[in-house]
């Protein structure tokens, strides 16, 4: 793969921090980028739209300042996640702000929009579209997406059911552009595994919930740090799209996690006034299956430093030259 110009030589690790609905914020994104990975956030986390402009200004200003002070260790680029579903009545306004700030990476979800892709490429950015199967993957590329985020089984939040081995290898038979692997990755070994199976980058989300910078309730962070794969429930009840959630939070809501009804996908609403979806993600905690490797709440920098050591050490074990 020819690495996109906006990413070439700018990453300490081949990792993109996934946008976490209600949780990602400027502090987390800035910490991720300063530590050498792509940081991202959903535009809808900034409410109202005017706050999005404040967030973009803060992130860009702090990263530029960091780069001036640390020319030998520049920050990685950041990304904004846009929900392109027809119910998101903020899309046009949010896209205009991203254009104003020339956001380098746009992550698109829940629909493929040719006009959005063209706009981003027009200002020099790239678009990464998250997909759960080959039909959506082909559609995204046909609509002009730069790269694909293959959301596999076990991923936190909205997730698919395909094995990452099957998903990545099949996608690689027809697509030579950037591929990101999403699903249960929380260690440096997992990052290397994603690269080895054919992905260019690992996409990590749930692990960042248990960081000091994340805008999550302390009980949520502890739930990630103390949880395991067995604590994850896959359901479409809360947003109309299948996703993975912490069992304990479902119980706290007075529901039986083993007997949840099906939702009606036609009821999805991602508009700026959508209270039901925001409530679902606030009270019912999304999480992927890879949280068993997260043992404590720590700073974003410490977690990424550990990822880097694990990644280098795993490469060393494979080639017989231990990292030190």
Q: What are these regions, as identified by a protein language model?
A:
Residues 1-178:
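Active-site entrance/lid segments in N-terminal catalytic domains of soluble metabolic enzymes
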Residues 86, 154, 184-185, 207:
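Acidic, glycine-rich active-site loops and adjacent beta-strand->loop/helix elements
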Residues 161-180, 186-324:
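Conserved active-site-proximal phosphate/metal-binding subdomains
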């Amino acid at each position: 793969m020819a690495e996109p110009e906006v990413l070439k030589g700018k990453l300490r690790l081949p990792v993109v921090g996934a946008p976490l609905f209600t949780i990602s914020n400027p502090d987390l994104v800035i910490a991720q980028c300063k530590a050498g990975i792509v940081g991202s956030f959903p535009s809808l986390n900034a409410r109202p739209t005017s706050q999005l402009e404040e967030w973009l200004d803060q992130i860009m200003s702090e990263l530029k300042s960091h780069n001036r002070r640390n020319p030998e260790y520049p920050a990685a680029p950041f990304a904004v996640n846009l929900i392109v579903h027809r119910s998101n009545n903020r899309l046009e306004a949010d896209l205009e702000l991203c254009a104003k700030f020339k956001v380098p990476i746009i992550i698109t979800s829940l629909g493929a929009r040719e006009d959005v892709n063209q706009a981003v490429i027009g200002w020099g950015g790239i678009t990464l579209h998250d997909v759960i199967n080959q039909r959506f993957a082909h559609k995204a590329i046909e609509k002009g997406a730069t790269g694909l985020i293959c959301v596999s089984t076990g991923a936190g939040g909205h997730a698919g059911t395909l094995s990452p081995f099957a998903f990545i290898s099949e996608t690689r038979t027809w697509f030579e552009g950037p591929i990101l692997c999403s699903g249960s990755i929380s260690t440096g070994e997992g990052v290397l595994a994603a690269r080895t199976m054919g992905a260019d980058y690992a996409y990590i989300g749930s692990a960042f919930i248990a960081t000091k910078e994340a805008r999550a309730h302390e009980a949520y962070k502890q739930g990630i740090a103390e949880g395991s794969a067995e604590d994850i429930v896959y359901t479409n009840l809360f947003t109309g799209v299948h996703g993975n959630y912490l069992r304990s939070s479902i119980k706290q809501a007075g529901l039986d996690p083993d007997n949840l009804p099906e939702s009606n996908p036609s009821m999805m609403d991602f508009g700026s006034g959508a209270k039901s979806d925001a409530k679902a993600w606030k009270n019912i905690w999304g999480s992927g299956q890879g949280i068993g490797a997260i043992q404590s709440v720590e700073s974003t920098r410490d977690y990424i430093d550990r990822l880097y050591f694990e990644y280098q050490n795993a490469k060393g074990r494979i080639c017989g030259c231990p990292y030190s």
